[in-house]
Amino acid sequence: MAFITKQLQETIFGIIVGNRDVFPDHLAKEGRKQIIEVMEEMGYNYVILNEDDTHYGVVETYEDAKKCANLFKKNRDSIAGIILCMPNFSDEKGFASALKLANLNIPILIQASSDEIDKMDRKHRRDAFCGKISVCSVLYQHGIPFSLTSSHTYPIKSEAFKNDIRRFEKICNIVKTLKRARLGQIGTRPAAFETVRYSEKILEINGITIEPIDLSEILGAINKLQNDDPKVKEKIEFIKAYTPTMDFPEEGILKLAKLSLVIEKWVVDNDLDAFALQCWPSIQDNFGIVPCAMMSIFSEGLIPAACEVDIAGLIGMFILQLASGSPSAILDWNNNYGDDPNKMVLFHCSNLPKSFFKDTRMTIHPIISDLKGADLTFGAIQGRIKTQPCTLLRVETDDIFGEIKAFLTEGNYTDDPLDTYGGYGVIKIPNLQQALKMVCNEGFAHHIAATLNEVGEIVYEALTKYLGWNVIYHRD
């Protein structure tokens, strides 16, 4: 493979099955068996007490809770989230003690099993409906955040529960990955773009590390590469297969290939999740290229690449990728669409991943070429964005209040007619004018991260409930 790609991380859940002494034990035993079957059917790894660790391998007493907590602490680095299963009323103190002693500080999903109308006798009645309320109350008292299922109760083997687990997995991935994220910064921001300034210190205290490198170091490494290097040739072939390049000179593709190879090595050597790049003006003056196509390829391979050294925008891209499992992009809030107050044009010039487009081709940069000339600005990706639902996210470090904040909304790309350049699409957002007022009044940048998926609720829950970020969620 000529370009590295990030593999989606394997998700491991910690499982706690509850029980309560005055309710039928066989329900807890069967519940443990069922949740294991669901985990294996869905392909998840899990950490759970063995049947000989406690009575049936479930948690009821304080001694049970200690055993569960010790097991979870041994697997602290691998467990991404915890699922509480309540086959009967279950003991709220057992759950709370296990969570408090383990002290993993990760997302928690609470499932409670439904009673069946024809099985409401003493042997079969669960009362998990009531028990779930009790568990939630106690976790609230302990200050332990948790997630709820789409229905208050349902069977462990229901499709609804499986869908909720998939949703919960995304929340877990966002929380776990952001707490140890490593992002690269190539060069300084363009001098004209104060809008993309950010606080590295605020990010660091939230677990996000920035690894900087000067653009001159990248260019210096490029100068040491030979044109006939087999790795360079591999990159050239990949770029040509990625998007049509018929109007693109071989010299330009060679430069893109070398740039890609050097940045790829830097990403691997520093174990980076994503990077932002000074894409103008220095690289045109000193290397004679625009890096948009290279950035598009990295983003398509699940290594988000943001332009104009927009680290805050890059974080938005990374979050949306974690929430959706698919590539993300960064765009400008760019134009009105006629007189429609709820439609606008999202645009960049562009480095969008190929999967965003109906079709693509490589071109000279439509804007920078007017300033620098066509010979120095090969490498942009052009095309229209697909007609699909979309989630938009802007992250900022607010130095005034010492916090991370974000703006989040959802919309739909349309097929309204538009003849323009770059990477673009018409998007409809309910009550768009109010959304724009929020963006302006709160000092958000003109960049917005995007994914072609509806993941707003997942992002909102992860960022607010588990990371404590200040998120403005604009929705219909």
Task: Locate the predicted segments by residue.
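N-terminal basic/disordered segments at the start of proteins
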Residues: 2-42
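Cap/lid and interdomain-hinge subdomains that line or gate substrate/regulatory clefts
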Residues: 3, 8-14, 46, 116-234, ...
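Extended hydrophobic packing segments that form well-structured cores
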Residues: 33, 373-476
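Glycine-rich, highly charged phosphate/nucleotide-binding loops
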Residues: 57-77, 255-262
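Periplasmic-binding protein-like
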Residues: 78-88, 109-111, 272-278
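Short, acidic/small-residue loops that bind anionic groups at enzyme active sites
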Residues: 96-125, 133-138, 296-309
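Long, internal scaffold/assembly segments composed of regular secondary structure
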Residues: 234-237, 241-323
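C-terminal catalytic subdomain
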Residues: 302-416
